[in-house]
Design a protein with these regions (language model features):
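Glycosyltransferase-associated regions of secretory-pathway enzymes
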Residues: 1-56, 72-201
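Small-residue hinge/turn detector
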Residues: 57-69
Length: 201
């Protein structure tokens, strides 16, 4: 177990308790049951993903479509009440120094059954079929993930009006300190799947 994940999950649970939000941690069994029972059209895609991180990305879109609510990565925790953000159909975050304002899928909100997430699922499927056949992506793990299930894929779908600066991102080891003016989330930006040199792209 990654210590930062354990620490920040505990903080998120406490935050939810204090703010009267329901908290759920999804395990692999939960995720696979959701695909089979609610999204059987994506069972083949689920098995076609080359990397587990693609499944981790994709399942969050299914969860938000099915149930709505907030998705928060394990290295992230909320820092202030989120009720003021609940007037949106969807809410995506971005790094405040990203001039292209690409949506960051570590933190996302949606109402249930939001058709935007159907578009996202279809775009993921299209890109996986296309890009996993390209030989260069055999060694470009990062690029494959970002362009099939990550922020580059989302940037082609999510309207700019749904993307907001809500994050404080701090990682001393990486030399990262980026903060919105009024951050709602603290992100330690662990990117645990990126540690193996073979995963670079």
């Amino acid at each position: 177990e990654i210590p930062v994940f354990k620490k920040n999950v505990k903080r998120t649970k406490q935050f939810c308790k204090e703010n009267n939000y329901h908290y759920k941690m999804w395990d692999l069994k939960d995720c696979e049951e959701l695909v089979v029972e609610k999204y059987p059209e994506y069972i083949c895609l689920w098995s076609e993903f080359r990397f587990d991180i693609q499944r981790c990305d994709f399942i969050r879109y299914l969860i938000l479509h099915q149930y709505g609510g907030w998705y928060v990565d394990c290295d992230v925790y909320p820092t202030q009440n989120l009720d003021s953000l609940l007037g949106f159909d969807e809410c995506f975050t971005t790094w405040s120094n990203d001039h292209k304002r690409k949506p960051y899928n570590a933190v996302m909100y949606s109402v249930a059954k939001n058709p935007l997430f159907i578009e996202i699922m279809k775009e993921v499927e299209k890109r996986v079929i296309e890009k996993q056949q390209i030989k260069q992506y055999d060694t470009w793990k990062g690029r494959l993930v970002f362009y099939t299930t990550g922020h580059h894929m989302l940037a082609s779908i999510v309207p700019k009006s749904s993307i907001h600066e809500l994050m404080l991102i701090y990682n001393e080891e990486k030399g990262i300190y980026i903060s919105a003016d009024n951050p709602y989330f603290y992100d330690e930006n662990i990117t645990s799947w990126w540690t193996d040199p073979q995963k670079k792209g």
